[in-house]
Amino acid sequence: MTRTAIEIPENVSAEVSNLALTVEGPNGSVTRTLWYPSVTVSVDEDADADAVVIETDETDAKTSATVGTFESHVSNMIHGVTDGWSYEMEVYYAHFPMQVSVEGDEVIIENFLGEKASRRTPIRGDTNVQIDGEMVTLTGPSKEDVGQTAADIEQLTRVTDKDTRIFQDGVYITQKPQQGGA
């Protein structure tokens, strides 16, 4: 039997309903479905401290690994609603000055390599995009949404059919959240 308890800080609340865990805190809320056969996720409201409990009766390696994965997901959710996740990106161009802007729930890149048409990608979830000159900062409570938005922006400016040693224009991730949840 494998059992793991992740303590919930005072300013954070957690709730499980229909296999979905919702964690709410000062920076917003994150909901994620945590389902695997014979693995249960529950909120233990003990007198000392609340905790998210992940447990299973199985002893095989795959189920134990899933418990560890769920533990990481819950820790990331708690970190996201308390401190948030942040990515930093840098706009780099040598040939044509490109403009990056936010319009509604889309990031728009204009004049990339002199193109007439603008390139667009959606902003995922509750991700907040701030543009300050050549720096783009993405923040939000969901690690997956912030990371995928950063990856989408980076892929949007991928150079194809040209020598990438010469054409290095693009928007590149310069700083990611460090492993270990910080």
Swiss-Prot record:
This protein binds to the 23S rRNA, and is important in its secondary structure. It is located near the subunit interface in the base of the L7/L12 stalk, and near the tRNA binding site of the peptidyltransferase center. Coiled coil: none annotated. Gene3D superfamilies: Ribosomal protein L6, alpha-beta domain. Belongs to the universal ribosomal protein uL6 family. Keywords: Ribonucleoprotein, Ribosomal protein, RNA-binding, rRNA-binding. It comes from Haloquadratum walsbyi (strain DSM 16790 / HBSQ001). One of its GO terms (molecular function) is rRNA binding. PROSITE patterns: RIBOSOMAL_L6_2. SUPFAM superfamilies: Ribosomal protein L6. Part of the 50S ribosomal subunit. One of its GO terms (biological process) is cytoplasmic translation. One of its GO terms (cellular component) is cytosolic large ribosomal subunit. HAMAP family: Ribosomal_uL6_A. This is Large ribosomal subunit protein uL6.
